[in-house]
Regions:
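Alpha-helix C-capping/helix-to-loop hinge sites
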Residues: 51-55, 76, 95-96, 115, ...
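C-terminal accessory module of base-excision DNA glycosylases/AP lyases that mediates lesion recognition
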Residues: 1-30, 124, 128-223
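Alpha-helical ds-nucleic-acid-binding substructure associated with the helix-hairpin-helix region
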Residues: 74-149
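N-terminal polyanion-binding entry modules of DNA glycosylases/AP lyases
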Residues: 1-101, 105, 217-223
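Non-catalytic, well-ordered alpha-helical scaffold segments
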Residues: 42-46, 67, 102-109, 137, ...
């Protein structure tokens, strides 16, 4: 597998964004393991839910309504939500202050159950915080397998938003990998995951940068 040097990608991205200083200012926060351990369970559930509602919808509208989501679902407190009877879930799903989509609202309870179960086995925040980013695609698959509507990029976007170091298979990143003949099958296949993980690991070794920043820089290099 022949890869473009990451320095070349970085320089192209810097040119696209008007210089290194502007490029650096665009890079997201990557939290330390300890900082991720300190993230409360209700914040993980809130961000999972936000990303589920943003999927296939206008992100701006979800963000505008988010304070209402927080209020309607009690700040996404896990145990409170798991004790809520079905008829109250149905009532909350029809609240006009949120986006009324029953299939997405239903994921809140299901993903709360995933977090609760992980806490019985050592802790959800600990699981995610200590997961080796060198095998980050396996964490995406864990979320898809154990949660609800967390396939595609939804789980990965959640991790990025909270601060876990992860690359994203965005349209631009996928286009880069295809243009350079690094992948040729479906982007969500195990083979593509393995190749992408290897590519990003090599760039990380070259640059010493977090996967999140490498992923963003590849995106910015595409124009």
């Amino acid at each position: 597998m022949i890869l473009e040097k990451f320095d070349d990608i970085y320089q192209r991205a810097a040119e696209q964004k008007g210089g290194e200083a502007r490029l650096q200012a665009l890079l997201c926060e990557v939290k330390s393991t300890q900082q991720l351990l300190d993230v409360p369970d209700h914040r993980w559930l809130a961000e999972l839910t936000r990303k589920i509602f943003q999927s296939g919808f206008v992100w701006r509208i979800v963000n505008q309504k988010w304070d209402s989501f927080e209020q309607v679902f009690w700040g996404f407190e896990i145990e409170k939500l798991l004790m809520m009877p079905d008829e109250l879930w149905e009532k909350k799903a029809q609240d006009p202050s949120i986006i009324r989509n029953w299939s997405k609202v239903a994921t809140i309870k299901q993903n709360a159950q995933m977090i609760y179960q992980a806490n019985l086995e050592g802790g959800f925040s600990r699981l995610l915080a200590e997961w080796d980013s060198g095998n980050i695609t396996a964490l995406w698959q864990y979320l898809k397998r154990n949660g609800k509507r967390l396939g595609g990029n939804t789980g990965a976007y959640t991790l990025r938003a909270v601060g876990k170091d992860t690359f994203l298979l965005t349209h631009d990143v996928e286009a880069y990998l295809r243009n350079h003949k690094l992948i040729d099958g479906g982007i969500q296949t195990q083979r593509s995951f393995t190749i992408a993980q290897q590519v990003f690991a090599e760039w990380q070794q070259q640059s010493g940068r977090p996967l999140s920043h490498i992923s963003q820089i590849v995106t910015f290099s595409m124009g």
